[in-house]
């Protein structure tokens, strides 16, 4: 069956709506609760902790039927600068869906990075880039064996999270979150408020206030 290219929904978030999330860490976004699409933390960045720039951009999705990677190939001509390639390979661990050649092409196009719920290879190269970020569940040296099946720009499941084309994807050392356009619009004020509270807590603790005072803990009792 040939690769299916779906027409994506209009990516109708404004640059301003997207930009406000650029300062929000994944942990703060996830603290919003069920509205935030937490992606399985087992999908990890290739770069070491502390050296991982933020992954940030709207999703272009592919569903692969590993060991076939046809959908990834077709996505190369669809994805646009600043977007994130989200590869649903159903957690397949034995065959890489992408390596340095295709990732290098995406990098040259100005793509923000990729997330693979499956395997990647050539990680020495991929992990050395600080302007193209790669998250993957698995690493394997074995390459794909077909390019005839799959689909592009449809809802997929990445790490147990439903991800649709146009969702905002944020990644950092702690993991990944996917936010629907509705959540991007309606929960940014809550995320910014949480970030402000965390800054307030840090300042209060540094000033010498007790944890009980800062966090409003109930009085303790003596045994």
Label each residue range with its predicted role:
Residues 1-165, 171, 179-223:
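Feature captures the catalytic cores and cofactor-binding loops of soluble hydro-lyases/lyases
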């Amino acid at each position: 069956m040939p690769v299916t290219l779906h027409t994506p929904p209009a990516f109708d978030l404004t640059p301003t709506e997207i930009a406000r999330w650029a300062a929000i860490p994944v942990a703060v976004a996830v603290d919003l609760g069920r509205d935030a699409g937490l992606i399985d933390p087992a999908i990890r960045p290739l770069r070491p902790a502390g050296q991982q720039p933020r992954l940030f951009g709207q999703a272009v999705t592919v569903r692969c039927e590993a060991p076939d990677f046809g959908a990834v190939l077709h996505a190369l001509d669809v994805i646009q600068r600043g977007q994130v390639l989200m590869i649903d390979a159903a957690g397949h661990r034995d065959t890489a869906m992408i390596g340095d050649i295709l990732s290098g092409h995406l990098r040259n196009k100005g793509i923000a990075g990729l997330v693979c719920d499956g395997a990647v290879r050539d990680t020495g190269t991929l992990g050395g880039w600080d302007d193209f970020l790669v998250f993957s569940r698995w690493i394997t040296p074995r390459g794909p064996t077909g390019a005839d099946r799959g689909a592009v720009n449809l809802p997929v499941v990445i790490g147990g999270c439903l991800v649709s084309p146009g969702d905002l994807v944020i990644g950092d050392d702690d993991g990944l979150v996917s936010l629907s356009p509705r959540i991007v619009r309606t929960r940014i004020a809550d995320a910014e408020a949480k970030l402000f509270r965390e800054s307030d807590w840090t300042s209060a603790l540094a000033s010498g206030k007790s944890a009980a005072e800062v966090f409003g803990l109930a009085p303790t009792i003596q045994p």
